[in-house]
Regions:
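Low-complexity, S/T/G/P-rich flexible repeat/linker segments used as non-globular hinges
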Residues: 105-131
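Short amphipathic secondary-structure patches
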Residues: 48-102, 129
């Protein structure tokens, strides 16, 4: 028997063994991309909400509402889905906003949501003499 006849069918066996591994790696790469994209959306939404809430000179409820609305609008515009309303903590010096965005899942062992928190100082208006 010649060498070519002995090696027949070896390539198809290799393809059958390697193809699932390549597909699994491709799916993991896609899931990782979705996770990092969602993480970017959550961070941007938290920053936008904190920035919107930090410039409001109103009651804490109005400040929190403005921050929530700004964060929610950015998540919707970017195509993400929040798991709950943004949580805004307002005190006299800072505004902290936490946004949780759901990650689209292809495979089960990746996290199902991303949480990002941004703390921003509140704007303070001072007189010229107080500077």
């Amino acid at each position: 028997m010649s060498r070519q006849q002995q090696d027949r069918g070896e390539v198809s066996a290799q393809v059958v063994l390697v193809t699932p591994v390549i597909i699994l790696l491709l799916v993991i790469a896609i899931q990782a991309g979705l996770y990092f994209h969602t993480s970017s959306i959550a961070g941007a939404a938290a920053a936008e909400g904190a920035a919107a809430a930090s410039v409001v000179r109103a009651s804490r409820e109005v400040t929190a509402w403005r921050g929530q609305q700004a964060a929610q609008n950015l998540v919707i515009e970017a195509g993400g889905r929040t798991t709950s309303a943004a949580v805004v903590a307002v005190n006299t010096a800072t505004v902290a906003i936490t946004v949780v965005v759901r990650v689209p899942r292809i495979i089960p062992f990746f996290p199902s949501s991303v949480r990002r928190t941004v703390i921003e100082p509140r704007e303070r208006f001072t007189t010229e003499l107080a500077r």
